Amino acid sequence: MVYGYGKSNMPHPNRKRKGTDTQYDYWEELLVMVSGLYALFCVFLVLFIFFDSFKQESNKLELSGKEEKKKLNGENRLSRDIQNLLYIK
């Protein structure tokens, strides 16, 4: 047999090699999956914080509108408390 013309031990380029190389593929896939899930978690966290702060701001505006209506109707908490104190005595 002449060297170089027999069966070669080199693997086919499309086949996976046996050994530690397949472990790296597994860890790479796992790392990509975990980083993708972490990115989704961060996106949902930012969206939750944004919409929660928006909801709190709208509640503040709603409350301030109710207080203005009370002031227009003559119902001020301080004046109401003073009136209650005057009637008790």
From Swiss-Prot:
Superkingdom per UniProt: Eukaryota
Subcellular location: Plastid, Chloroplast
Keyword Plastid set for record: yes
Chief place of localization: plastid
Keywords tagged on the record: Chloroplast, Plastid
Cellular component GO terms, alphabetical: chloroplast; plastid
Short name of one Pfam family: Ycf70
Similarity comment: Belongs to the ycf70 family.
Name of the molecule in the record: Uncharacterized protein ycf70
Biological source species: Oryza sativa subsp. indica (Rice)
Gene symbol of the encoding locus: ycf70
